[in-house]
C-alpha cells in the first residue's frame, strides 16, 4: 500500500479526528495509529503537532491518560478545570521577582499552561511549558506574589 502524503493541516486535522474518536495515551500510539492509515510520520513531527494543536492529557483512571482536544469555552469551565489540574498534577510553585515556576507531574505542564493562557489575565504576560515545568511571567513583582498565593490555594482545593 502507498503512503499518503498529507499537508501539515491535513495531518493535524486527521490527528484531531483520531483523538476525538479514540483513546490515545502516548505519542507512540498516535504514530502507530497514523501509520496504520499509511500516513508516515515521525515521533518528532507528532510531538510538534501535539504542541501546536494544544492537546491536553486527561486522566482516564488507573494511572492512565489520553490525549484530548481542549474545548472549554466559558471562563468558569477554564477555572474549574484549572483547579482540578492544580489539585491533581501540580507539585510545587516557586517565585523569583515577577517570574513563577510551576512543577507538574510528567506530561501535564502544557495542559495547565494552556488553561492559564485561556484565562487571558492582565497580570500574566505569558507562559512557557515543557514536559513537567511551566514558566509564568507576571507583569509585576506584586502580581507575581498574588499569583503564587492563588496557585497555592488552587493546589489545596
UniProtKB/Swiss-Prot annotation:
Compartment(s): Cytoplasm
Disulfide pattern: none
Domain of life: Bacteria
Lineage, opening ranks: Bacteria, Thermotogati, Deinococcota, Deinococci, Deinococcales
InterPro entries named among the record's database cross-references: Arg_repress (IPR001669), Arg_repress_C (IPR020899), Arg_repress_C_sf (IPR036251), Arg_repress_DNA-bd (IPR020900), WH-like_DNA-bd_sf (IPR036388), WH_DNA-bd_sf (IPR036390)
Family: Belongs to the ArgR family.
Recorded GO MF terms: arginine binding; DNA binding; DNA-binding transcription factor activity
Pathway named in the protein's UniProt entry: Amino-acid biosynthesis; L-arginine biosynthesis [regulation]
Function according to Swiss-Prot or TrEMBL: Regulates arginine biosynthesis genes.
Keyword Transcription regulation among record annotations: yes
GO cellular component annotations of the record: cytoplasm
Broad class of the protein's primary localization: cytoplasm
Taxonomic source organism: Deinococcus deserti (strain DSM 17065 / CIP 109153 / LMG 22923 / VCD115)
The UniProt record lists the keyword Glycosyltransferase: no
Membrane spanning residue stretches: none
Name under which the protein is recorded: Arginine repressor
Alphabetically ordered keywords of this record: Amino-acid biosynthesis, Arginine biosynthesis, Cytoplasm, DNA-binding, Repressor, Transcription, Transcription regulation
One of the protein's GO biological processes: L-arginine biosynthetic process
Amino acid at each position: 500500500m502507498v503512503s499518503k502524503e498529507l499537508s501539515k493541516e491535513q495531518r493535524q486535522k486527521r490527528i484531531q479526528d483520531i483523538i476525538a474518536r479514540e483513546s490515545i495515551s502516548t505519542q507512540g500510539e498516535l504514530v502507530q495509529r497514523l501509520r496504520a492509515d499509511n500516513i508516515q510520520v515521525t515521533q518528532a513531527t507528532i510531538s510538534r503537532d501535539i504542541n501546536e494543536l494544544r492537546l491536553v492529557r486527561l486522566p482516564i483512571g488507573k494511572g492512565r491518560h489520553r490525549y484530548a482536544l481542549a474545548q472549554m469555552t466559558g471562563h468558569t469551565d477554564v477555572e474549574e478545570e484549572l483547579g482540578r489540574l492544580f489539585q491533581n498534577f501540580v507539585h510545587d510553585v516557586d517565585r523569583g521577582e515577577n517570574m513563577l515556576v510551576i512543577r507538574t507531574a510528567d506530561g501535564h505542564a502544557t495542559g495547565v499552561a494552556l488553561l492559564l493562557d485561556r484565562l487571558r489575565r492582565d497580570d500574566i504576560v505569558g507562559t512557557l511549558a515543557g514536559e513537567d515545568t511551566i514558566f509564568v511571567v507576571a507583569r509585576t513583582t506584586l502580581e507575581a506574589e498574588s499569583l503564587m498565593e492563588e496557585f497555592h490555594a488552587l493546589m489545596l482545593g
